[in-house]
Amino acid sequence: MKRVFRKVFPLRKEPTPVPSLPENIEDIRQKALKGHHLEIVQWGQVLLDSVYVPKDPASALEWFTIAAKAGFGPGHNMRGRCFQFGWGCDQDLTEAARCYEEAAKAGDEWGRYNLGILTMRGIGQPQDLPKALDLFRTAAQNGHAKSMNLYARFLEEGWVVSQDRAAALDWYRKSAEGGDYRGQHNFATALADAGKIDEALDWWRKAVVDATSDILLAMNQKLVLLGEKRDTALETRVQRRLQELGVPVPNSAAIRPA
């Protein structure tokens, strides 16, 4: 009897089933599957960190790469984020800088900002303050709030540019109005230094919602130094947020005017 040999193929791994998603998230996924560049990046961001699906940074990077290969700036920017922080890949700061460079060339302001940060600090490439200034200035002029804040800092300090504190204040204001908590804190600080305490407090109240620990600590110090004009309710909010972040709250009595 003739024996029949059958070629055995390995079983293909079944794709991980996608849980039931809210309508807006499912719409993003479907558009991503159809090749829409914006939704490709958005779906990658869902996979990167979302309550709707299990975190899958490696798959997120694959989606960002698809968008980047299509020349889509936000795709390059998110690839840069992955390489900068080691999301779904080994950390590679040089590659992160290259991705941000591509994002900036494609006109993505977040990519321009992120490249500016690395360039300013000499991360993944040699430090180049004139280049960083140019990146922040361009992104600021194009409406990027975080870049407005850093462009203002260059102007305030006179870093590789003529010092212009009036222009710096104007850019801090624009950054604050654009919703950047660092810009809001810096603008509030300038207002307080000019004696415009009520206006300053209004901006600090906005900043406290999203501020990171470094800004919260600086804000707490400024609030304590207001003395009789201080807003104790706002101080309490700032200190509560620091506690939530696991940051020790400085003793107010230890904070003294410089």
Predicted feature descriptions by range:
Residues R3-V8, I215-A258:
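Terminal, low-structured helical/coil segments at or just beyond the last alpha-helical repeat
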Residues Q42-D49, M78-F85, R112-R121, L150-E157, ...:
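Hydrophobic face of amphipathic alpha-helices that form TPR/SEL1-like repeat modules
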Residues K34-H36, D49-V51, K69-G73, F85-W87, ...:
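Short helix-capping/linker turns of helical repeat alpha-solenoids
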Residues G73-P74, G107-G111, G143-S147, A176-Q184, ...:
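Boundary/linker segments of alpha-helical solenoid repeat arrays
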